[in-house]
Regions:
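An amphipathic, aromatic/His-enriched active-site/gating alpha helix that lines ligand/cofactor pockets
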Residues: 62
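RNA-contacting regions in translation and RNA-metabolism proteins
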Residues: 1-52, 69-87
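Short glycine-rich loop/turn motifs that provide flexible caps or phosphate-binding loops at active sites
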Residues: 52, 56-59
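Residue-level signature of catalytic and energy-coupling elements of molecular machines
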Residues: 30, 57, 66
Length: 87
């Protein structure tokens, strides 16, 4: 298992930023904020109002896929990570 450090957790937020920028029409308005707790890290993803539907997807499928990717990567680091999509 890889030891989780702020650098490796930062790579998770960079991963979410890269994926979100590929999905939206206004990639310059994608912002990612990371809140590191003792056991859990929260990654807040904010996109333009016009792009929120593209990030959530039909019936939340795209958001679920993003969370699955994030959970898989964070499990390898031995950390629990939550993705919050902010309007």
């Amino acid at each position: 298992m890889v030891q989780s450090t702020p650098e490796t957790l930062g790579s998770l937020s960079k991963l979410m930023e890269t994926l979100a920028m590929a999905l939206v029409d206004l990639p310059e308005q994608v912002t990612v904020n990371e809140i590191i707790g003792e056991n859990t890290t929260v990654i807040e993803l904010k996109v333009a109002k016009e792009d929120i539907g593209k990030i959530i997807g039909k019936q939340g499928r795209t958001a679920m896929a993003l969370r699955t990717i994030l959970n898989g990567a964070s499990t390898k680091l031995g950390k629990r990570t939550v993705l919050e999509i902010i309007e």
